[in-house]
A protein has these predicted regions:
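Long, charge-dense tracts
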Residues: 1-118
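An N-terminal structural lobe/cap that precedes and organizes the functional/catalytic core
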Residues: 134-201
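Conserved phosphate/anionic-ligand binding catalytic regions in large, soluble enzymes, centered on
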Residues: 153-169, 260-267, 298, 401
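N-terminal regions that are enriched for targeting/export leaders
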Residues: 113-132, 138-139
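Aromatic-rich carbohydrate-recognition surfaces in CAZymes
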Residues: 191-231, 261
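Extracytoplasmic mature domains of secreted/periplasmic and thylakoid-lumen proteins
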Residues: 217, 222-262
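Active-site nucleophile and cofactor-binding loops and adjacent substrate-binding regions
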Residues: 191-199, 257-263, 294-302, 367-371, ...
Length: 401
């Protein structure tokens, strides 16, 4: 049956009714309008759900584009200022108008040829990435063994603990956390394990359980829109793109300024868990997952964490794992410059605090949700944690990431 026939069938079979005043739904638009007003307001000023840290996602969008080597116009900055003022006044008519204009400015941002971003190779595909790195031979792992099952249990438990801990403190500097709480060595309140650190991994697992190692980025994307109602920053825009029929890799690049933020990097663990002892396979799966919402260095962040997770099943020395993972990032990429700098700081500084301060200063132009400062904090925590989970957790918590 053709679409016109379906529509005609509905029309021909419609039976006239008289609706009561209460049944008419035009006034329901008032509630719908309030929903969209509140949702838009979050882009201009909100608080992180778990920690309460303030954030302004529209400001961060400009920051993220400039980090990626683009120049936002003076008009864009003027609109940014006006939007912040309109949001503060709750002038939603003006805020909707400014937001539309602002998004056009972001979409039309011009390449900044003077940006150091373009001094590095930008990696657009797994094939391009694969040609530039050397992977070790895969080490067979008996996935039916009790040892492997215990490793998987520990992996999930550690992620849940880390996620619960992180959501309490994310978005605050080390200095302010220290001032407010001293040394944080345990939960500051009753932990909550529901967060986006885990939900996207479960969506990947859902697609993987059906397709196995043949899983595609499209499979993962469909799992997202079927299971995850909403996201934030890169993931929110990717979900919106997918629902509009824009699939990977375009879902991660189309009007998505946040595609080098932490989102892909944070969900990499599952890719390593389903590829134990095989970092090349873990990297390939991470690329498929990453390009749903991210691109370039954002995907390399997921690759980095995925290969570390994969190697952790067959290597117990944490510094060896981190160092080997760094070697699996192309040396001409900007992401490599970040992780190698963080590693160098660790090698040269006596304390994690000293290493952190150096990284904070070097990457102060990046939002705390960007992949780069997060990667630095990971390396610092793993290096100085020396394989002790409690010590590592303490350091990463104090980093406020």
């Amino acid at each position: 049956m053709k679409a016109w026939e379906m529509a005609q069938d509905v029309y021909n079979n419609a039976q006239p009714v008289i609706r009561s005043e209460e049944e008419q739904t035009w006034t329901d638009n008032v509630d719908v309008s309030a929903f969209y007003d509140d949702n838009l307001s979050l882009d201009w000023g909100s608080n992180v759900p778990g920690s309460g840290a303030p954030e302004k996602i529209m400001v961060a969008a400009v920051q993220a584009l400039e980090n990626r080597g683009y120049r936002v116009s003076e008009k864009g900055y003027r609109l940014l200022k006006e939007g912040l003022q309109a949001n503060e006044k709750k002038d939603f008519v003006k805020l909707h108008q400014i937001s539309a204009l602002m998004r056009r400015e972001l979409a039309e941002a011009e390449k900044d040829e003077t940006s150091s971003y373009w001094d590095y190779t930008v990696y657009h595909s797994f094939e391009q990435y694969r040609e530039k790195v050397q992977f070790p031979e895969a080490v067979p792992v008996n996935v039916e063994s009790e040892e492997f099952k215990e490793q998987i249990r520990a992996s999930w438990t550690a992620q849940l603990v880390g996620g619960a801990m992180g959501t309490m403190v994310e978005g605050y500097t080390f200095q302010n956390l220290k001032k407010a709480f001293g040394d944080v060595t345990g939960y500051l309140r009753e932990p909550n394990t529901y967060n986006d650190d885990i939900t996207f991994e479960l969506a990947f697992l859902d697609a993987f359980s059906e397709k196995g190692y043949e899983v595609t980025s499209e499979d993962i994307a469909l799992s997202w829109v079927g299971l995850i109602p909403c996201g934030w920053s890169a993931e929110e825009l990717a979900i919106r793109n997918i629902k509009n029929g824009i699939f990977p890799p375009e879902s991660g690049t189309y009007r998505n300024p946040f595609n080098e933020w932490i989102g892909a990097q944070m969900r990499a663990g599952i890719c390593g868990m389903v590829a134990p002892g095989d970092p090349c396979l873990a990297a390939e799966l991470a690329w498929k997952d990453g390009e749903v919402s991210h691109a370039a260095n954002g995907i390399l962040g997921e690759v980095f964490n995925a290969v570390m997770t994969s190697m952790a099943f067959v290597e117990s020395d944490i510094k060896t794992i981190v160092k080997n993972a760094i070697s699996m990032i192309p040396e001409d990429s900007e992401y490599y410059s970040v992780v190698s700098f963080a590693w160098k700081c660790c090698e040269e500084q006596k304390t994690w605090e000293e290493a952190l301060l150096l990284c904070q200063e070097k990457y102060k132009r990046y939002n705390w949700i960007h992949a780069y400062p997060n990667a630095c904090c990971e390396i610092i925590a793993l290096y100085y944690g020396e394989g002790d989970f409690q010590k590592t957790l303490h350091i990463i918590t104090m980093c406020g990431i």
